[in-house]
Design a protein with these regions (language model features):
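Beta-strand-rich cores of mature extracytoplasmic or soluble domains
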Residues: 82-159
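Structural motif
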Residues: 29-38
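Structural beta-strand segments of beta-rich domains
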Residues: 25-27
Length: 159
């Protein structure tokens, strides 16, 4: 009877592990606000990301968030946030683009000027040579090139 029970528990644990779909890797959570308004606070799947001042981000990390290893198509997270008065809570489900769980440094959330929210699991930060967000939407200020900011720093406030 004990052997049958142990076998049953072993099968149950195997089944639960298969449903989970793999191991996880824990990394820091960081936000970037590309908009003109503060984000009162944001969350990713219930993990608190904190306050984001307009046109700021990347300077503060919160611990921690787990991502699946390995990545697989269709992975999504629920991003929640409030407005600059910490009111009007909203949520959006966002797909996680492909990442290499062996080369992660942070889980990045971007609140973009066009209203989109994008997430990435990169090794480095915004403006770094391999950072996935590029082009006009990448700058924290309109017209700003984060690669130049990453290389030389921000030359004063552009407000």
């Amino acid at each position: 009877m004990k052997i049958a029970r142990c076998v049953l528990y072993g099968l149950l644990l195997t089944w639960i592990s298969a449903c989970h779909g793999g191991n996880t890797v824990t990394t820091n959570l960081v936000g970037y606000n590309h908009t003109d308004k503060d984000v009162g606070h944001f969350t990713v799947d219930g993990n608190e990301g904190g306050f984001l001042q307009a046109h700021r981000g990347g300077g503060g990390f919160t611990c921690c968030i787990s991502v699946l290893d390995p990545w697989r198509p269709g992975l999504k997270v629920k991003v929640g946030w409030t407005d600059d008065y910490d009111e009007n809570y909203q949520e959006r489900v966002v797909e996680i683009p492909k990442y290499d769980a062996k080369r992660t440094g942070q889980f990045s959330v971007h609140f973009l000027r066009n209203g989109e929210i994008k997430v990435f699991v990169p090794l480095g930060g915004l403006g770094g040579p391999d950072y996935p967000l590029k082009g006009p939407e990448a700058g924290l200020y309109p017209g700003e090139d984060p690669v130049e900011v990453w290389k030389h720093g921000r030359k004063g406030d552009q407000k």
